[in-house]
Amino acid sequence: MLNYIAMYPNQYEGLMNPDIILGKQDTPIEDFIIMAMKELEAIDNIKIENIEIVRDQDEVDINRHMINVNYKKKNIDEIEIPKYKYIADSRYGEIIFTIRVTTNLNEKVITKRILYPIEYNGFYYNNGKRMKAIWQLVDGSTYAQRGKNTLKSRMPIIIYQNRKRIITDINDMKYIVTSYSYALNGKSKKPGAKAKVKFINPVMIYSAKMGYHNTIEFFGMQDIVSIETKVKKDEDLYYYFPLNDMYIKVLKDKFEKYDLVRAFVCMTYNLNSADFPVTPKNIDDRDYWTCRIGTVGTAKNKNLSTFREKGITTIFMIERLLDATTIQNLRLPMYYKSNIYYLIYWMMISFDELRTKSNIDMANKRIRKNEYIVNSSLGKKINENINRLIEKRGKSRLNSMDTLLELFNFGSDIIVSGMRNLNDLIKTDDIVNDNDFILDLAYSSKGPNSLGDGNNKKIATKYRYLHPSMAGILDLNTSSNSDIGLSGSFTPFAKLYDGYYFTPDHEPCQGRYRFEKDLADEGFRKIHGNNFDEYLKYLEKHDKFKELLKYEAIKIVEKET
């Protein structure tokens, strides 16, 4: 009888999901490293000319990664490489980047090597230790908090909604409408202090890129909202709201029917400024709006132009928010994630749908492994270095080749060293038998970009609770001894979609289409396409704003002596 048990049909055998056990669909770690390094090409002075991947560990000279290379030195080739033979068993590959750094006065070609761990039978051998990387359970895209939605990216992208903003028309009638604000996290002046948040009017951001009238069209408000210098005799059809010495003119029926129209009018109304009024001359002046952005959260000054550099730096910071990894993972049409400006617009028009998401529903979660190994160390360091360069850019004495070369002054073993600090996610192997199958299914909600930002006391109790969506995905019999509900094990039957999501449903993104379709049904405007897919193809093909919303060039120009 025992000889035939293996032949007995098992009804659950076909339900086993090898992808979650073996992780074969995970993006290779080399791809994440290349994506992280390519972020440096956001700076016009830097161009990666060649990439060589060395997967054979016998061809990797570990001694090259045991020294700190200062790229500001003139003769890097003269640095002496030690010749040691290490006893510790480690399995590493390396990626060799050939990078050309140029300025208006100088040029230099450097070689940057990045050491990375090679997985062998599900384990890493790092500095003589056998390590196992487990899954990290993170938010799939956005998560909702009181009055705001946050998209997890390189840095959080935060949109606030205020449903009780009061605006007053020229007849002193008050309206309670919805408005949106973009929140940019600033630096705290004191170590450990809470960072200050800048609340910026989104219409101001778009106007700084392409002027106000192009912003009207980008939001789909053409023929609905306009700016007038005087009130016309058509108040039976239009509402008029003051905008300094001008007026916001909006169709009454559309204002009363559509929340998108009311929100746009409110954001425009909030552009009023007693110190730096909006005029017909400056309403489409990008430089004016850039300076206005620079005034947010700063001390008052009667000279608007003094805020220009601050405004440019803020725009650079906004354009640094969205990284290639987020674009790859986000389940949206490319139109809405092609750059940060389209993404902020999507977050506003889809705010209510995103707000209804449950933060503990597994449908709003995904898992990752190679991503956090790279981005928690290399990705984070590159981001910090670029932000530091942006802040230095306005100081002419720091605009030099040395400032650019400082971007590369980090250890080539930054990834393998960083792995040793990810104790919640990368476990040192202490299994005394060959039953390591359970480790392949282990997960943790802790780690980089996780709940509580590394402080478990900040995590609300509700995030430790069970949710109906966890049935069939999480092993309800397994949990952490010290942090209940924050780590455990998946079942081998959990289904995965689009890589590592738990639902086939993509992000809601039809808010603008529904708005345009309603206008078409009223006979007010023609819609292009018979369905959402056709409408989206038309937008992508006839996108006049793509060039207007392209990122500003980050460029270092050396001062001639």
Where are these regions (language model features)?
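N-terminal non-catalytic structural scaffold regions of very large proteins
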Residues: M1-N435, Y443, L466, T491-A494, ...
